[in-house]
Amino acid sequence: MKDTIKIVLIGAGSKEFSRGLIHDLVLDKELPHVGRIDVVLVDINANSLRTMLGYAQRCVEVTGSPIVFSATENREEALPGADFVLLSVAIGRMDLWEQDFRVPLAFGMRHIYGENGGPGALFHALRNYKLIFPILRDIER
């Protein structure tokens, strides 16, 4: 068994997604049994990144979780040795997400909640490929 598990969260400045993930990690009673866990938060927005790192560290203080959080704005710096990489990135997330529901509805198709099904999901995927593929190439390296 590996001594350390490294998780990289790209787009960690997202308060909605990151906060939930941080809670899940620090509150999980099984994770301490798998060894050391390092979580690297990555975001291009330095202020949001700093806020989420502070939040993660406070959660560790309160819960006594053994997880070690760190942060960087440079994903290439964060990726080497990663066992898991999670992406929480999107172009124009909130502004365009509403459009993903409205456009299909105008043609009689009620879109389900989320980015995972129907024509709205296709819109979401197509506009984000340009953002996601360079990240995937960095992960491959």
Regions from the language model: what does each represent?
Residues K2-F101, H111-R141:
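Metallocofactor- and cofactor-centric catalytic cores in central/energy metabolism, strongly enriched
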Residues P104-A106:
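Mixed-charge, low-complexity segments
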